[in-house]
């Protein structure tokens, strides 16, 4: 285990893996940062238990929407923007390997307060919405990107979740959602 130090000014809100690289949202710089997975493995091996300053080894890619959460699906980076009062947006990007630049392909309206996005192998889209530790979070399930694009306020299923349910991922037909709790009370000795 190693900790990588990133941009200290940013809210690093999302992370994705494309098979070769780890991508991290940097909302402060309005970009996503790419870190080679080989570098991460090397640092974990050589610097176990340490904090490694990785600011100089990341590649920054500017994006047209403020990155709040991110996923990799179908050869694309899907980057969503969190807003409070109006519909947010999600943009699908393609990495042009010749120019090493992200190319925006499609732009979608999505519900407000989106903090996580993922897809399953069938193309179903899952969005996690959350704001604060005292309000319920919601999981929105759509049959496809087309269903999301045409009816963002009408998911196939909407599930109430505990507060602060944010990032999510699908692996082996199982949806994983880490949940943060507002408080943990432990007994103390006086």
What are these regions (language model features)?
Residues 182-188:
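Conserved small/polar residues in nucleotide/adenosyl-binding loops
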Residues 9-14, 63-70, 111-118, 162-169:
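Repeated scaffold domains used in trafficking and secretory/extracellular systems
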Residues 3-7, 59-63, 106-110, 157-161:
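Surface loop/turn motifs at the tips and blade-to-blade linkers of beta-strand repeat domains
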Residues 37-47, 93-100, 144-149:
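Short loop/turn segments immediately following beta-strands, especially the blade-tip
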Residues 17-19, 72-74, 120-122, 170-172:
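Residue-level detector of Asp-centered blade-edge/turn motifs that repeat once per structural unit
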Residues 109-144:
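Loop/turn-rich, solvent-exposed surfaces of beta-rich toroidal or solenoidal domains
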Residues 149-169:
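Conserved blade-ending motifs and adjacent loop-strand segments that build the rim/top face
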Residues 24-28, 79-84, 127-133, 177-181:
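Conserved beta-strand positions in repeat-built beta-propeller and related beta-rich domains
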């Amino acid at each position: 285990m190693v900790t990588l130090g990133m941009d200290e000014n940013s809210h690093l809100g999302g992370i994705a893996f494309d098979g070769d690289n780890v991508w991290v949202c940097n909302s402060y710089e309005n970009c996503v940062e790419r870190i080679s997975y080989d570098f991460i493995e090397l640092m974990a091996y050589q610097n176990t238990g340490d904090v490694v300053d990785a600011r100089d080894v990341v590649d920054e890619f500017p994006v047209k929407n403020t990155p709040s959460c991110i996923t990799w699906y179908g050869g694309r980076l899907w980057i969503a923007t969190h807003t409070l009062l109006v519909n947010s947006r999600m943009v699908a990007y393609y990495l042009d390997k010749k120019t090493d630049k992200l190319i925006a392909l499609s732009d979608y309206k999505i519900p407000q307060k989106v903090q996580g996005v993922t897809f399953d192998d069938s193309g179903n889209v899952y969005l996690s919405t959350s704001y604060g530790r005292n309000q319920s979070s919601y999981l929105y399930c759509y049959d496809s990107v087309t269903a999301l694009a045409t009816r963002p306020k009408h998911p196939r299923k909407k599930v109430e979740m505990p507060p602060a349910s944010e990032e999510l991922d699908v692996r082996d037909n199982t949806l994983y959602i880490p949940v943060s709790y507002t408080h943990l009370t432990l007994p103390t000795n006086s």
